[in-house]
Amino acid sequence: MAKPLGTTGEFFRRRDEWRKHPMLSNQMRHALPGIGIGVGAFCVYLVGEQIYSKLMAPSSQSSHQKQPAPSH
């Protein structure tokens, strides 16, 4: 048999009732399926693009050496 709640247990049960509200349960998770995976993939893309741009950026020394000769 379960132990009776008392005043403290009743307080915590009433305080946490909002967590079981239907709008906050599975409905929000099912409303946007895959949003977490999409945000994660987009973040990986952004990090990869930053790494790629830093690796492929011309260095300051090489840009001075490869200037075309003036055609007069």
From Swiss-Prot:
Main location (coarse class): mitochondrion
Annotated compartments: Mitochondrion inner membrane
Membrane association type: Single-pass membrane protein
Superkingdom of the source species: Eukaryota
GO cellular component, one term: mitochondrial inner membrane
GO BP of this protein: electron transport chain
Keywords: Electron transport, Membrane, Mitochondrion, Mitochondrion inner membrane, Respiratory chain, Transmembrane, Transmembrane helix, Transport
Signal peptide location: none
Pfam families: NDUF_B12
Keyword presence, Ligase: no
Transmembrane annotation, as ranges: 31-48
Physiological role: Accessory subunit of the mitochondrial membrane respiratory chain NADH dehydrogenase (Complex I), that is believed not to be involved in catalysis. Complex I functions in the transfer of electrons from NADH to the respiratory chain. The immediate electron acceptor for the enzyme is believed to be ubiquinone.
Subunit description: Complex I is composed of at least 49 different subunits.
Family: Belongs to the complex I NDUFB3 subunit family.
Record-given protein name: NADH dehydrogenase [ubiquinone] 1 beta subcomplex subunit 3-A
